[in-house]
Curated annotation (Swiss-Prot):
Organism annotation: Paracoccus denitrificans (strain Pd 1222)
Cofactor(s) recorded in Swiss-Prot or TrEMBL: Mg(2+)
The protein, known as: Polyribonucleotide nucleotidyltransferase
Gene3D superfamilies: GHMP Kinase, N-terminal domain, K Homology domain, type 1, Nucleic acid-binding proteins
GO biological process, alphabetically ordered: mRNA catabolic process; RNA processing
C-alpha cells in the first residue's frame, strides 16, 4: 500500500531521519524529518501553470507548532491553534529566506510549503528540523529547485563551538552566562545562504568561525537529502528559464539613457520620480505584444540592476554620491518626547526612526506560551513600518512578517547589553516607529533603541549600533562590499548583511545571500567594513548620550525590591488576598510577589513605595529583644496592659513594668487606645511577648538610664 523510503544518519548527539511515501501522498513532495524525538512534516505543492500576467514568484511558507506535539492543549476560549505566534512567524521566515533564491530564475508558478510540528521532545528545537524537512520535500517534489539546502544551530561555550545545543541552553540566553551564541546557518553544499544570530559581544573572527563550523556540520545532512531524492524523487517538472533577451534589448534601447540619468540623482524622491518617468517612456515605446510579455518586469529590473551594479564595480560613486565605505550623515537627538520615559530620534541619511522606551513592572512582562513551556520576558521591542515612511499609500493593520522579523533582529542586538533582572527589576518596552526609510531601518531601530533606553535611565553595559552591508558580485568574479546600503542597493544587490554590536564585539548578525559564490574572503571584508561603520556610528551616537541617565523620568515608575522568607508570603497576601489589597489601597503602590520571596514595589511616588515597604516589613520582620517600639494599648486587665506593636503583634506589659511606682490597676496611668513606647523584654516559656514601659521615656522614646530609674522610683 505504501511505497515508503526512510534514510537516517547520526548527526551530532542525535539520529536524524527523513522519511517519505507514507503520509500526505497527494502533495507534490512530503517529508517527515525527525531529530531525536522532534518530528516535523513538510509538504510542498506547486501550480503547474503560472497565473496569466504574473511577474513575480509567489512562494508561501507556513510553519505551525501543534500543541499536541508536546502533549499540551491550547489555551484560550476555543482551545485550538489560532494565529501564528512570534516563534512560528520567525521560523517561517527562516525557512523562506534560504530557499527563495534557489528556484530557477523566471519560475513564477505558485509554490506552497507547509511545515507542521508533529512531535517535540523539548530538547531539539523544531526550527532546524523544519528547515531540513522543507528542503527535502522541495528536492523530491520535482519543482525546479536548485537545492538542497541544510541548516544547523551553533552555540559557543567555553571557547568551543557546539552543534545544535538543546532548547534549554538557548532559552533566555541573557540569563545563561555560559552560552554566548545562538546562530542559525543555512546553505547549500558550496555556499552559505542565510545566517541569523544572537551573540554576546563576540569578535568578527569568532562569528565567522561559527558560520564556517555550521556550514561544515550540515554537509552530512545535504548528503542525506540527496540520498533520499535518489530513491524517492519525482520526475523534474519541465521548465526552462525564459529567454527575454530580445525584449531586454528593446527595453535597453528605449530607456537606458534616461534610466542612467535618473540613477545619477542623489535624492531618493527625485530619483524615484525620474525612474518612473523613464519607465513610462519605455512602456510607451513598446508594442502591445511586448507590453503583455510576463517578463517585462524582469527586463526592466535587469536594466536598473546593470546600471546600479556596473557603476559600483567600475569604481564610480554610488547613486547617492558616496564611496563604498562611507556611512550616510547621522543626527541623534534624545529626550525628543516630553512625557515618555525615554525617547530618541535617530536619522541616518533618508532613514529615520523615532524610538520610545517605557518602563513597567513585573505585571507588564510578556507571557510566552511555547511548546517547551511557559516563560516570561521583561524586554519587548516592537517595530512599526507605516506606508508613509516610504511615501506610499498602503495597508495599515497588525504587524506583518517583515515587521516581526525586523523587530526581533533589533531585539537580539540590544538584549545582550541589558542589565540582569535582579539588578534592574523593570519591564522594558521599546517601540521603533520608522518615520522615513531608505534602507537599513532595522539597524536604525537598534541605534535609536540604544539611545532611547539610555535616555530612560536603563544602565546598559554598553551602547549598541548597527549597520547594513551590501554586496555586488559579478559573474567575472569582481566584487564590492558596500557600507550602509540604500533601499535600491538592497533590492538590486546580491547580499543583505546586517551587523550590530558594541565597541567590544558583535551582538547580532543577519545575512541573506541571493547568489552562490560568497567566499570567506568576502565575508571577512564585509565584517571588517561593518566594524569600521559600527564604530563610526557609535561615535556619532555618543555626541548625544554616551551612557544611561542617572535619574529616571518623573513619569516613570520607581521599583524597590525586598526579599522575605517564603513562609511569610502567606502572611503578606492574607486570606483571600485581604492583606495585600489593603497594602496596595493604602499605599497607592503596585506590589508584585514572586514564589521565591522577592517582592517588587512600584510607584512613581517615592512616599507610596516607602509606605508599602514599611507595611510589608512590619508583617514579615521579627521584633528584636531590647529594642524600643511604638505601640497602642488595646486592653487593660488587672495584671497589666496588652499593647499592639510592630504591626499586628500583641504583648503584655505587666503592671509592675508600667511605671516606676506601685500601681493598684493599670488604668491609673493608661487608657485603651493610648499610644505608648515599649521595650521588648523577651519571651516567656510559651513564647508570649513581655514588654516594659517604665524604662522608656514616654516623651522622647529613649531608654532611661539606670540611675535615673532609681531616682524616679524614689520620687
Amino acid at each position: 500500500m505504501f511505497d515508503e523510503v526512510k534514510k537516517s544518519i547520526q548527526w551530532g548527539q542525535e539520529t536524524l531521519t527523513l522519511e517519505t511515501g507514507k503520509v500526505a501522498r497527494q502533495a507534490d513532495g512530503s517529508v517527515i524529518a525527525t531529530l531525536g524525538e522532534t518530528s516535523v512534516m513538510a509538504n510542498v505543492t506547486f501550480a503547474k501553470e503560472p497565473k496569466p500576467g504574473q511577474d513575480f514568484f509567489p512562494l508561501t511558507v507556513h510553519y505551525q507548532e501543534k500543541y499536541y506535539a508536546a502533549g499540551k492543549i491550547p489555551g484560550g476560549f476555543f482551545k485550538r491553534e489560532a494565529r501564528p505566534s512570534e516563534k512560528e512567524t520567525l521560523t517561517a521566515r527562516l525557512i523562506d529566506r534560504p530557499i527563495r533564491p534557489l528556484f530557477v530564475p523566471g519560475f513564477k508558478h505558485e509554490v506552497l510549503v507547509m511545515c507542521t510540528v508533529l512531535s517535540h521532545d523539548l530538547v531539539n528545537d523544531p526550527d532546524i528540523v523544519a528547515m531540513i524537512a522543507a528542503s527535502a520535500a522541495l528536492t523530491i517534489s520535482g519543482v525546479p529547485f536548485m537545492g538542497p539546502i541544510a541548516a544547523a544551530r551553533v552555540g559557543f561555550a567555553d571557547g568551543e563551538y557546539v552543534l545544535n545545543p538543546e532548547v534549554q541552553d538557548m532559552d533566555h540566553l541573557r540569563l545563561n552566562p555560559e552560552q554566548r551564541l545562538d546562530l542559525v546557518v543555512a546553505g547549500t553544499r558550496d555556499a552559505v545562504m542565510m545566517v541569523e544570530s544572537e551573540a554576546y559581544e563576540l569578535t568578527e573572527a569568532e562569528m565567522l568561525g561559527a558560520v564556517k563550523f555550521g556550514h561544515e556540520a550540515m554537509q552530512p545532512v545535504i548528503d542525506l537529502i540527496i540520498d533520499l531524492a535518489e530513491a524517492a524523487a519525482k520526475e523534474p517538472f519541465e521548465f526552462a528559464s525564459p529567454d527575454y533577451s530580445a525584449l531586454y534589448a528593446r527595453v535597453k534601447s528605449l530607456g537606458e539613457a534616461d534610466m542612467r540619468a535618473a540613477y545619477a540623482i542623489h535624492d531618493k524622491g527625485e530619483r524615484r520620480d525620474a525612474i518612473e518617468v523613464a519607465k513610462a517612456k519605455v512602456l510607451a515605446g513598446l508594442s502591445e505584444e511586448e507590453l503583455l510579455d510576463p517578463n517585462l518586469g524582469s527586463a526592466l529590473k535587469k536594466l536598473e540592476s546593470g546600471i546600479l551594479r556596473g557603476g559600483i564595480i567600475d569604481g564610480r560613486p554610488r547613486i547617492d554620491g558616496r564611496d563604498n565605505k562611507t556611512v550616510r550623515p547621522i543626527d541623534c537627538e534624545v529626550g525628543f518626547l516630553p512625557r515618555t520615559h525615554g525617547s530618541s530620534l535617530f536619522t541616518r541619511g533618508e532613514t529615520q526612526a523615532l524610538v520610545v522606551t517605557t518602563l513597567g513592572t513585573g505585571d507588564d512582562e510578556q507571557i510566552i506560551d511555547a511548546l517547551h513551556g511557559n516563560s516570561r520576558s521583561n524586554f519587548l521591542l516592537h517595530y512599526n513600518f507605516p506606508p508613509y515612511s516610504v511615501g506610499e499609500v498602503g495597508r495599515v493593520g497588525s504587524p506583518g512578517r517583515r515587521e516581526i522579523g525586523h523587530g526581533k533582529l533589533a531585539w537580539r542586538a540590544l538584549q545582550a547589553v541589558l542589565p540582569a533582572p535582579t539588578d534592574f527589576p523593570y519591564t522594558i518596552r521599546v517601540v521603533s516607529e520608522i518615520t522615513e526609510s531608505n534602507g537599513s531601518s532595522s539597524m536604525a531601530s537598534v541605534c535609536g533603541g540604544s539611545l532611547s533606553m539610555m535616555d530612560a535611565g536603563v544602565p546598559l553595559k554598553a551602547p549598541v549600533a548597527g549597520v547594513a552591508m551590501g554586496l555586488i558580485l559579478e559573474e567575472d568574479g569582481r566584487w564590492a562590499v558596500l557600507t550602509d546600503i540604500l533601499g535600491d542597493e538592497d533590492h538590486l544587490g546580491d547580499m543583505d548583511f546586517k551587523v550590530a554590536g558594541t565597541e567590544n564585539g558583535i551582538t547580532s548578525l543577519q545575512m541573506d545571500i541571493k547568489v552562490a559564490g560568497i567566499t570567506p574572503e568576502i565575508m571577512e571584508q564585509a565584517l571588517a567594513q561593518a566594524k569600521d561603520g559600527r564604530l563610526h556610528i557609535l561615535g556619532e551616537m555618543s555626541k548625544a548620550l554616551s551612557e544611561g541617565r542617572r535619574e529616571f523620568s518623573a513619569h516613570a515608575p520607581r521599583i524597590e525590591t525586598m526579599t522575605i522568607p517564603t513562609d511569610k508570603i502567606r502572611e503578606v497576601i492574607g486570606s483571600g488576598g485581604k492583606v495585600i489589597r489593603e497594602i496596595v489601597e493604602t499605599s497607592g503602590a503596585k506590589v508584585d510577589i514572586s514564589d521565591d520571596g522577592t517582592i517588587k514595589i512600584a510607584s512613581a511616588n517615592a512616599d507610596s513605595i516607602k509606605k508599602a515597604y514599611d507595611m510589608i516589613y512590619s508583617i514579615v520582620a521579627e521584633p528584636e529583644e531590647g529594642k524600643i517600639y511604638v505601640g497602642k494599648v488595646v486592653k487593660l486587665v488587672d495584671f497589666g496592659a496588652f499593647v499592639n506593636f510592630f504591626g499586628k503583634r500583641d504583648g503584655l506589659v505587666h503592671v509592675s513594668q508600667i511605671a516606676g511606682k506601685r500601681l493598684n490597676h493599670p488604668n491609673e496611668v493608661l487608657k485603651e487606645g493610648q499610644e505608648v513606647k515599649v521595650k521588648l523584654l523577651g519571651f516567656d516559656d510559651r513564647g508570649k511577648v513581655r514588654l516594659g514601659m517604665k524604662m522608656v521615656d514616654q516623651e522622647t522614646g529613649e531608654e532611661i538610664a539606670p540611675e535615673k530609674k532609681e531616682e524616679t522610683a524614689e520620687g
